[in-house]
Amino acid sequence: MGLSEEELKEGHRKRLRERYFRSDLKSFKDYEVLELLLIYAIPRIDVKPIAKQLLIRFGSLRRVLDAAPFELLGVPGMGPNSVGLFRLFKDIASRYLEEEVRSCDMLDDIEKVSDFLRMKIGGSKRELFVPLFLDMHNHLIAYDVYRGSVNQNNVTPREIVTQCLLCGASKLIIAHNHPSGVLEPSQTDIRFTRTLKMLLEALDIQLTDHLIVTGNLCHSIMPLIELYEKRPEYNSGL
């Protein structure tokens, strides 16, 4: 007598789990990663079609995990348990990267900082602004996440200076995301950075970097700021 359909599905789930424990995710395709997650949230059904549909709908594994709950619920087969698991998975990864950042020299290990920022704001469809407040040893004291951007006047240089003073920061890194994926800074980005840098210097606080963040990259605009400072003729239009 052959195996029932339910037994075949359970056998596939077991093999998928065993394969992961043998070789982690290196040999897994993106849909298999999602399938592995889904088997812990959705019992007794074949979740492979759901995993593949998620990739079709959102385009990549990262975009699936960055999707809002209501967007995920729009995919047939996705329910509160699976959406909650996806959110938990991403939040745990973000917490892990935050601990990595808190234990490092943030100016010497910019790769960890970039990983943290890409996880935190890189996939957001709305603009977010993040100041990272550092002590004199380049360790993270605190950070904040502001909704909106410098272009929308949601964040002001004076507000960030006040936060630096309140937490006793000696140095500051700022970052904001570009949901469009374009890394080029706007004129407002440049004006904001130069104003903030000037205000901080008067208080002996160093603005060490301003990063534009997308899902895949972090790009520093500080070399451009330094160019403006060295070449006054570049100031036209600011």
What is each of the regions a protein language model found here?
Residues 151, 194-238:
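Divalent-metal-activated hydrolytic enzyme cores
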Residues 149-188:
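Short HxH-centered metal-ligating active-site micro-motif
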Residues 139-148:
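Glycine-rich active-site/cofactor-binding loop and its immediate structural neighborhood
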Residues 122-125:
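Short loop/turn motifs at secondary-structure junctions and domain boundaries
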Residues 129-133, 138, 209-212:
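Short beta-strand scaffold segments in enzyme catalytic cores
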Residues 1-72:
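Long, highly charged, low-complexity intrinsically disordered interaction regions
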Residues 97-113:
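Long, charged amphipathic helices and adjacent flexible linkers at domain junctions
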